[in-house]
Amino acid sequence: MSKPETPAASNFLRPIVQADLDSGKHAKIITRFPPEPNGYLHIGHAKSICLNFGLAKEFGGECNLRFDDTNPAKEDQEYIDAIKSDVQWLGFQWAGEERYASDYFDQLHDWAVHLIKAGKAYVCDLTPEQAREYRGSLTEPGTNSPFRERSVEENLDLFARMKAGEFPDGARALRAKIDMASPNMNLRDPILYRIRHAHHHQTGDKWCIYPSYDFTHGQSDAIEGITHSICTLEFEDHRPLYEWFLANLPVPAQPRQYEFARLNLNYTITSKRKLKQLVDEKHVSGWDDPRMSTLSGFRRRGYTPASIRNFCDMIGVNRAGGVVDIGMLEFAIREDLDANAARAMCVLKPLKVVITNYPQDQVENLELPRHPKQDMGVRVLPFSREIYIDAGDFEEVPPAGFKRLVPGGEVRLRGSYVIRADEAVKDDQGNIVELRCSYDENTLGKNPEGRKVKGVIHWVPAAESVECEVRLYDRLFRSANPEKDEEGGSFLDNINPESLVVLKGCRAEPSLANAAPEERFQFEREGYFCADMKDSKPGAPVFNRTVTLRDSWGQ
């Protein structure tokens, strides 16, 4: 297992934070993670979580969890609960109670009135379509709204009537009065408040006007005393507006915004809209489908919090973009599970083996280590006359280099004896349904005298093994860039039809019968697996493949 070639991980924010503390600019660092509760967190959010919580922890500060809940039509308590669970699962805890932008709606409203009284905000009656036309483009300046010069008194009256619910959705908006000719389109009189007659999951029906993200964000940071407001690069052009609001309002603190490059992972989609489409159109079983890029999907697949944190450390934090190879994430989980997952044997495609020269009623309880390096104890495998091996480990006409069982050939059973294939029993269609073999009783734990046995295969006892279901998960998309389709199709056209193969009737060693939900294993010679957190039951386990033993994608 070799580590992927990557530049040394860096974090350009560390020296900034250190300098701010050393200079006395801040006595304590306070960061925040501010998700919008309109979907489940995905692997891209993990980078932001690890960055914000990680910096706070490293420098002895605090990190707030604040829900940016300014768009009630798209938000839901389900998402709030899932986000809290995901952050804690990753190993982080926010300072105090979780916070909501809606906690500050009264203060934000008062600050909007402050801007109106200062002549820096006005109520605009342009429709959304008209407002887009007046806004101009990247190459053309905008045009002032015909409502821009309303008096302070008229604006105060109209804003109060907006708040009172007098007007329908979209009829009016409160806008900041900045500069319609600014080369930065975010400064062309941005919207502060929209009319939305929508029930809010936190405030109920108290409000029918809701603040915009840009008006909410910086002021929420200021209220909470955030010292370093860290967001992704697409908000770099919003920073002048962030600073304009702070400069023109009587806020209690002056946070500073910093931007970093978001995580772009190949073979992966992180657009919430597209993830929701996958769920709604039943291309996957839900937000926690193990093929999804959501944290709940990775968790159900068997990824550990440590592997995701280590992955985020590996890729570092910088301002340069680029696409990260998903092989780095797969390396992180392989490295973790290789070190920490107990070993077990599971036969995915069982073929019965009868050892004809083994005593009829004899059973030997063989002890095998649960881990080759760590002291995890042993598990017991009963060995008797009938066992199962994988059907792929026997070939009547073997290809070149085949080192497993062939007619008349020998192979070692893992932790057990050497057996020889004597006869293949077939059904009427010519399918092999049973092997008759003989064993060498002098080969338990040692090589046979005078001959070399190269192959080692896994096995389970026939009588004591437990039947189980195994789900072989693979990458959901077959293209490294699933968003891009050469023929102009949809990202859905890139779905990998082999991203899930369900195998029923698999046979697992007895120690796996009561595997706990989310318990992780290396199935020897097969890969890393975990017991499904929803469907696996005592005596009827269901295992999800987390990742293969080695990277075989595209080989």
UniProtKB/Swiss-Prot annotation:
EC id: 6.1.1.18
Lineage: Bacteria, Pseudomonadati, Pseudomonadota, Gammaproteobacteria, Pseudomonadales
GO CC entries: cytosol
Xref: HAMAP family: Gln_tRNA_synth (MF_00126)
Family: Belongs to the class-I aminoacyl-tRNA synthetase family.
Protein name: Glutamine--tRNA ligase
Catalysis: reaction(s): tRNA(Gln) + L-glutamine + ATP = L-glutaminyl-tRNA(Gln) + AMP + diphosphate
Quaternary structure and interacting proteins, as annotated: Monomer.
Alphabetical keyword list: Aminoacyl-tRNA synthetase, ATP-binding, Cytoplasm, Ligase, Nucleotide-binding, Protein biosynthesis
